[in-house]
A protein has these predicted regions:
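Extracytosolic ligand-binding ectodomains
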Residues: 2-6, 10-12, 20-407
């Protein structure tokens, strides 16, 4: 049909037009705005250079029967270190910080050598310690082999500085002077004719007792008994009973306050009224506490291996005030000598402008007239203190009283 043909032609034409139309591409999305430039990062401040730390070791018995003395010594070292850091010390053109490495030797020789090696391994520049001769002497070999200076504030056995080591120094008089002075005092002043001697078998106790006995005999007295115990003993009935039978005018004990206190109590219970003498190990307020009412006035006589009098006493008194304010306790015995030992060691470093032991050791050995709170400090060729003082004391009214300072 004509109409049908016409419609077919129209449809075909429409299809051709549709097939021939070119498709327009979709418009491209608008470009995102460029991000603002990030601010340049602020450079972090350069880290401060690490502090130049100088390690100084301290060793004493901070556990055991005489821990009160070991802690006293450690406090003396800590006070010195804190003051040095507050003041500021320059070595080799740099400000240095001192660090205290404190170790406990429990007054035991084996533990003493172990902590000595520990300090050597930690590369300390020097060591102040030990307290007891029995730990100081074996430890000194380790320090000597490492070339590390050692200053003992309290060891009195002469052997310590007579081993030929260049690294050993002491701050107090030795047993030759300590025991010798007490021996002469027992005979000449206390008028002791018969004297009993007890020691605790330690290097310190045995050493001071031997020197005391020699001096007694040289002064014309007689040693009527020699007994020994240990530094950990608590029962002395057997040896005191033996001594009582000898009726001595004086009983001398070479040992420490922790043993002497109970010994005095047992002397009272056995009705032994002899004078009681000892070295610096018993010359403490702790002895007075431990002995209690067993100590009669003018019964106990002792000598502290050190001491100051006259104008020099001002410095010691000022130290005691500082110590009490910082640690809320009184000085027990050797804290001032530890304090001085640290300062003497650092003064040698300053003089050498180095904390290298090899460089400052010669300066330490030539220390002369250093003004310490314990008095002037000078060392002789062996490392012993020159003109070491002794302070004679007695107990009256439950207090230690100074009788005299001797040199």
């Amino acid at each position: 049909m004509r109409i049908k043909s016409t419609l077919t032609l129209i449809a075909a034409a429409t299809l051709l037009v549709a097939c021939g139309k070119k498709e327009e591409p979709a418009p491209a999305p608008a470009a995102a705005p460029a991000p603002a430039a990030a601010p340049a990062p602020i450079a972090a401040p350069a880290p401060a250079p690490a502090a130049n730390v100088v390690k100084i070791g301290h060793v004493g018995p901070t556990s055991g029967a005489i821990a009160h003395l070991g802690k006293d010594n450690e406090n003396g070292a800590r006070l010195a270190i804190d003051e040095l850091n507050a003041k500021g010390v320059m070595l080799g053109g740099q400000k240095v910080t001192f660090e205290l490495l404190a170790e406990d030797d429990a007054a035991d020789p084996k533990q003493g050598t172990a902590v000595a090696q520990k300090l050597v391994d930690a590369k300390v520049a020097g060591v102040v310690g030990h307290l007891n001769s029995g730990t100081t002497i074996p430890a000194s070999t380790i320090y000597s082999e490492a070339g590390i200076p050692q200053i003992s504030p309290s060891s009195t056995n002469p052997k310590y500085t007579r081993q030929g080591f260049k690294t050993t120094f002491r701050m107090v008089a030795d047993d030759t002077q300590l025991g010798g002075t007490l021996g002469k005092y027992a005979v000449n002043t206390l008028k002791g004719k018969s004297i009993a001697v007890i020691d605790d078998r330690t290097a310190y106790g045995q050493g001071v007792a031997e020197e005391f006995a020699k001096a007694v005999e040289a002064a014309g007295g007689k040693v009527v008994a020699k007994e020994f115990t240990t530094d950990k003993a608590t029962d002395f009935t057997s040896i005191l009973t033996t001594i009582k039978a000898k009726k001595p005018d004086v009983v001398f004990f070479g040992g420490m306050d922790a043993v002497a206190g109970p010994m005095l109590k047992q002397m009272k219970s056995l009705a032994i009224k002899s004078k009681f003498m000892g070295g610096d190990g018993i010359c403490t307020t702790e002895l007075v506490k431990l002995g209690g009412d067993a100590i009669a006035d003018n019964q106990v006589y002792c000598a502290e291996a050190g001491g100051v009098d006259g104008e020099a006493k001002v410095g010691m008194d000022e130290f005691k005030v500082k110590y009490q304010a910082k640690f809320n306790t009184d000085v027990k015995l050797y804290a001032p000598y530890v304090y001085d030992a640290v300062n003497v060691m650092v003064a040698a470093m300053v003089k050498a402008d180095s904390s290298d032991p090899a460089k400052y050791l010669p300066m330490l050995a030539t220390t002369a007239d250093f003004k310490g709170v314990s008095g002037p400090v000078s060392f002789d060729e062996k490392g012993d203190i020159k003109n070491g003082a002794l302070t004679l004391k007695t107990v009256r009214g439950g207090q230690l009283e100074t009788l005299a300072v001797l040199r």
